[in-house]
Swiss-Prot record:
It is found in: Cytoplasm. This is Peptide chain release factor 1. Methylated by PrmC. Methylation increases the termination efficiency of RF1. Residues 288-307 are annotated as: Disordered. InterPro entries: PCRF (IPR005139), Pep_chain_release_fac_I (IPR000352), Pep_chain_release_fac_I_sf (IPR045853), Prokaryotic/Mito_RF (IPR050057), RF-1 (IPR004373). It comes from Nitrobacter hamburgensis (strain DSM 10229 / NCIMB 13809 / X14). The keyword Signal does not apply. Peptide chain release factor 1 directs the termination of translation in response to the peptide chain termination codons UAG and UAA. Keywords: Cytoplasm, Methylation, Protein biosynthesis. Belongs to the prokaryotic/mitochondrial release factor family.
Amino acid sequence: MSSLPEAKLDILLARHAALENELLSQISAERYVQMTRELSELNPVVEAVKNWRAVKTEIAGIDAMIADPATDAEMRAMAEAERPALGARGDELAQKIRVALLPKDAMDERNVMLEIRAGTGGDEASLFAGDLFRMYERFAGLQGWKVEAISASEGTMGGYKEIVAEVRGRGAYAKLKFESGVHRVQRVPDTETQGRVHTSAATVAVLPEAEEVDVDIKTDDLRIETMRAQGAGGQHVNKTESAIRITHIPTGIVVMMQDSRSQHKNRASAMNILRSRIYDAERQRINAARSADRKDQVGSGDRSERIRTYNFPQGRVTDHRINLTLYKLPQVIAGDALHELIDALTTEHQAAQLATEGGGA
């Protein structure tokens, strides 16, 4: 049966016991929420550790019985028959514990800024961007998260040329972070009279929502411009300069916001997006430096990388990073089966982490 770092397990169990004891004392409501959240994360792994140790003890007893010359043949045969299943159970529990002990991404519990932009393919790309947004909106709803569109530029035939939304909920970044990249669709557009399959694309960016303490943005580094909000075809939709464009001069990152009639609200939303983009750009730079000699095929997060193809004629979705194909496109694009892709990507990423840990890197 696989071995585990017993000292780490003891620390984990001690932390769990300390939290349970502290819950019995007089604590603030805020502290109570923090503790119950941590306990809910620890409970499954603590149970796995206790079960693993019980299996380990049972295997030791069986091995002693098998090795004992005084054990009769029938009992030895029963013990030898029972041991493989126990060993497999122990290995299964050990793997679960190893995954739980992996270093956590500090951003995993953050809310998310979700940005979807139509790419090549004209109106069809905008329609596809709309499909992707609804897919994530439905998936978020199934997780109990809240989705709020902050900025949207609608396509001529529907969908979106670009949409930015905030996804609020526990573990939003952990679930959605592998969705960044180019999503490609192959289907026959409604406007296609010859029945030909067209290929279009949309780019998805998933950014952990940055807090003010994460990014130091100096006022002198910002160029802030106000203007009248523009409607379809360039018409003015109001007579006040409520639209805001903020440029972060050092990075060249630009955010335009005009969805609210309130300049104050547009400015706050623009700063929130700008903060997340600057923070994400720095994280991307650091991650690129760290992975210069080691490629994580799932977690690269390269926005120019084609990560997934949605083929409507064949009813399939293929994730190119892990070579996984699901023949349930309607369920995936509806958001109901998206979790199957996300779970597979998470498992692959964890396997890569475990391999790195095992290699002593």
